[in-house]
């Protein structure tokens, strides 16, 4: 059966909709452990409206979510069903070989086995397959789509699915919230897409231990809604639709990483199903352990290439007693970056330090009718007691004034804080609104904090000289910054210019002992930079690990490890 609404899959104004689901569960208490038990008989809900701004931002790019005419043939019938004319060939640095892949027909015997395992939670419907095979939030091209989409409900089903696919050597592509921008959910070799959205239970909450055990399909926003009544929260904040499983797979972070760290710092243990069907527990629930290899960190950031995550134990934090949001303008991005560095060097425990350049502020003004000063802007969030946060705010105001800061504003009341923070939250939406019909190439470089001002200044000079609309958005407290490079996907010249700018920033970051990706992951888009960043020996070690755990190369093929190194 087809699970998704045909209405939302058609070429209509609603084509940006993503399925959003409620927790299919009812709470019950077991001492200090709170368990959400699944409601029997509940199945995947149809597509519904999302309240987040993120789908609206992506919807502004009409080409990002255009669907193929429903009369197009299935990929399993013809490998030319998707247009690959724009794919570029370019030696070992090209992802062309990975994007195209080698298509192999899925045996009928495997589909029969999967139907036995999953009953109705399986579909070969073209619309559903295309929806899962197309990159929802990125410019990366899809040349193949999955032949089958499956929706497991338990770890046992995941184990059986992987074991069956491994027997027939059929590729498996794990699928979470689909908010990744580096092509992580592409299916270059077709195969089976394993959608984890039905596995979204909160299995246990340990309030006194400040940890929670969840299934991979739950979103971080859903989880925090559940945790709020206990005075706890999970402190990572990537894209609104991101699922916990996908966040582990990509080793993501967000604007709060400067205070709470990244995903690798906030996961205590995992359960992972390996390609042969074995279920591996990576660690105990203890806050620290010296027992054996750190399998938890091996899986975090592996992007579905080693197995499928089925259970996550997360470290939680207390909801802060008080917070202050502050905003300040600067004459140059270097001045703003210098203040971010000086703030961190002062020892102040900020929870957020975000930088937006004047082009980004202009986009927000144009898109939302605001009248903000169009200058490089720093945004801070301070948390703690009321007295402590006010003291932090005053110290940072003094630091900013020494670096030509002006128009320093801060807010403590909830509505006022929300209004100030909307400046940052509306940034991506504003870019799409300012360049309708365009796609965004979003960069993700990160450098040691001492090099941030130099990198942003160097990049800003190159961006301003380009004919493309380019904005800067940085997590300035930890050296990570993004640029939104808007380009017309129908213009090869603009695409090449966007790629050139991306290359420039990545190679600049690498020259400063930085990385090509601070939080978005490698996927297909960043593979070409890994050898320069890590060295061939590191890539060969990754290959040996992959070969040992996944000898048939069925797990998310064409991702993470460059094609000239892999099988």
Swiss-Prot record:
Expressed in leaves, stems, flowers and roots. One of its GO terms (molecular function) is D-lactate dehydrogenase (cytochrome) activity. Residues 142-319 form the FAD-binding PCMH-type domain. It catalyses: (R)-lactate + 2 Fe(III)-[cytochrome c] = 2 Fe(II)-[cytochrome c] + pyruvate + 2 H(+). Pfam families: FAD-oxidase_C, FAD_binding_4. Inhibited by cyanide ions. InterPro entries: FAD-bd_oxidored_4_C, FAD-bd_PCMH, FAD-bd_PCMH-like_sf, FAD-bd_PCMH_sub2, FAD-linked_Oxase-like_C, Oxid_FAD_bind_N, Vanillyl_alc_oxidase_C-sub2. It is found in: Mitochondrion. Optimum pH is 8-9. Belongs to the FAD-binding oxidoreductase/transferase type 4 family. Catalyzes the stereospecific oxidation of D-lactate to pyruvate. Involved in the detoxification of methylglyoxal and D-lactate, but probably not involved in the metabolization of glycolate. This is D-lactate dehydrogenase [cytochrome], mitochondrial. It comes from Arabidopsis thaliana (Mouse-ear cress).
